[in-house]
Amino acid sequence: MTDHTNDSSDKNGKLLYCSFCGKSQHEVRKLIAGPSVFICDECVDLCNDIIREEIQESASEGSSDKLPKPHEISAILDQYVIGQKRAKKVLAVAVYNHYKRLRFGDKTAKDKEPVELGKSNILLVGPTGSGKTLLAETLARLLDVPFTIADATTLTEAGYVGEDVENIIQKLLQKCDYDVEKAQQGIVYIDEIDKISRKSDNPSITRDVSGEGVQQALLKLIEGTIASVPPQGGRKHPQQEFLQVDTSNILFICGGAFAGLDKVIRDRSEKGGIGFAAEVKSKDDKRNFGETLHDLEPEDLVRYGLIPEFVGRLPVIATLDELDKAALIQILTEPKNALTKQYGKLFEMEGVQIDFRPDALDAVAERALERKTGARGLRSIMESVLLDTMYRIPSEEHVVKVVVDELVIKGESEPLLVYEQVEKPPKAASAED
């Protein structure tokens, strides 16, 4: 039924027309009058659609401008992670291409011959404490996307005690207050991925629910599927309405130390021989774990225990080097959140300056190398060395500086406390005077 208001007819009863489309007041639902002009409800809707599309286009253009270039991503990673130049380059290109694919995917779909861009998930391989998790965390913070870390060792096949692989997506949803659209553009880091390698090359009568079984369960999730996730999680609330999350645009980064992988690589790459055909090598020719990883091929991961289908879902492989003494000293001092800067800020809150002598930093790096835990061991060393000092300082008066040298790190002396000079009050005059 046509709805006319007093605005859609003049005082003389003359038939009115829309000034934009030319339709009469009887052909439209509503005609709105302005100063000597009229507009119908259909033209208003059309204007709203045009404005809405322009806003969306400008928003998408603005968001694409905010996407940092690969060299910018690498430069920002340099501020937080020391070394690992090649790994940063691989990550920067992979992440840039992934989010470029998301932001321009709709435009390529309108082409005469649309090209579907595949997703490039990432595998980080490197020794403990080399910066795998920190790289993933820094990327997510840089791109301002939801980020979650999952531990592969806690995952099991559905129906067994442990976490389902869908719980990973639920954790991602929790990070963005169950905003499905945001979660679908997030980053998931699966740590300890090497711990779910197949236990044996030979088929077994017992089911490997935490190894190959988990790899099988992760296949579709990583490649892209519609995951059904309960808002409150788990199997305890089957009556809840499930959220449908498309994982095809979620970037999965898997990381692991892969202890023993260097031997697998050497067995493949180093040709053996007998007698005069044998290749002679000195002990000095033996490369360390990180250097050996540079020759990593997908087939080595399969021999290590990852199933071929799972390796195929992780086309981008970045290897990280072992951290040497010089790199550990840099980690202590150079990054934005370097440990020496963190402890400096803690002591500054008490009005005290802390001074780490160069020989102290050298000794900390030496102890970390002995522990073979990479950069992860640096904080525990610093905590144990500074524990007593941090216990005393809040109660001590007039302390202005703490000096830490090599002997302190080795446990042979205590940190040197420097006090401010306090003037003693003059003695009161005696009664005899």
Swiss-Prot record:
Protein name: ATP-dependent Clp protease ATP-binding subunit ClpX
Keyword Transcription regulation set for record: no
Example GO BP: cell division
Keyword annotations: ATP-binding, Chaperone, Metal-binding, Nucleotide-binding, Zinc
Similarity section: Belongs to the ClpX chaperone family.
Assembly and oligomerization: Component of the ClpX-ClpP complex. Forms a hexameric ring that, in the presence of ATP, binds to fourteen ClpP subunits assembled into a disk-like structure with a central cavity, resembling the structure of eukaryotic proteasomes.
GO molecular function: ATP binding; ATP hydrolysis activity; ATP-dependent protein folding chaperone; protein dimerization activity; unfolded protein binding; zinc ion binding
